[in-house]
Amino acid sequence: MPITDWPADERPREKLLSRGAAALSDAELLAIFLRTGVAGKTAVDLARELLSRFGGLRPLLQADLVSFSSARGLGSAKYAQLQAVLEMGRRHLSESLARGDALTSPDDTRRFLAARLRDYPFEVFACLFLDNRHRVIAFEELFRGTIDGASVHPREVVRRALAHNAAALILAHNHPSGVAEPSRSDEAITRRLRDALALVDIRVLDHVVVGDSLVSFAERGLL
């Protein structure tokens, strides 16, 4: 049965307008994004099929162009639309820490870092640069790929910190696996960065690992 023949309060779009987006299931939200189904399937049916194929909403949102576009009902145009939506969401959440804002809430800082890094399908290493009053100067993604001692260069981190005239910074990187537990490599590169930055009187306040949850090196006593 076409969605247009469903009772009004069961149609995803009408349900969202009357009850809010939080009332919708993952399949219903995805169906609104898809707009149409395929032969023999409504948009909701197709959404359920895609969620099953990818293993849930998050893996679908993290899929690369090739795997995303190979699924029936999707393609490069939908992939581009999805990336635009995700980036708008990241930017919206990022506004919680604008330039000049002081870091008064660890929770706000972590939400910001999660918004920026959580959904990347590859590892990204970033720095949040702060002034001597712990106000935000800039956020930069510096390295992509496998985060280890060979790919994160302390000299470049120091160079960018000095360019921003930063007095302190927060390191962050994501684990695409969703497991936020720091590795020994994470601990080693954190020590190298801390020591390199200390030579120019710049403090490392924390290193946050972003996965399905967040791990703070400062809270663990790993700094």
Swiss-Prot record:
Residue span of motif JAMM motif: 173-186
Keyword Protease recorded: yes
Keywords, alphabetical: Hydrolase, Metal-binding, Metalloprotease, Protease, Zinc
Highest taxon of source: Bacteria
InterPro entries: MPN, RadC_JAB, RuvA_2-like, UPF0758, UPF0758_CS, UPF0758_N
Entry GO MF terms: metal ion binding; metallopeptidase activity
Residue ranges of domain MPN in the record: 102-223
Keyword Endoplasmic reticulum listed: no
SUPFAM superfamilies registered for this protein in UniProt: JAB1/MPN domain, RuvA domain 2-like
GO terms under biological process: proteolysis
Pfam families: RadC (PF04002), UPF0758_N (PF20582)
PANTHER family: DNA REPAIR PROTEIN RADC, UPF0758 PROTEIN YEES-RELATED
Protein name (Swiss-Prot/TrEMBL): UPF0758 protein Tgr7_0100
Lineage start: Bacteria, Pseudomonadati, Pseudomonadota, Gammaproteobacteria, Chromatiales
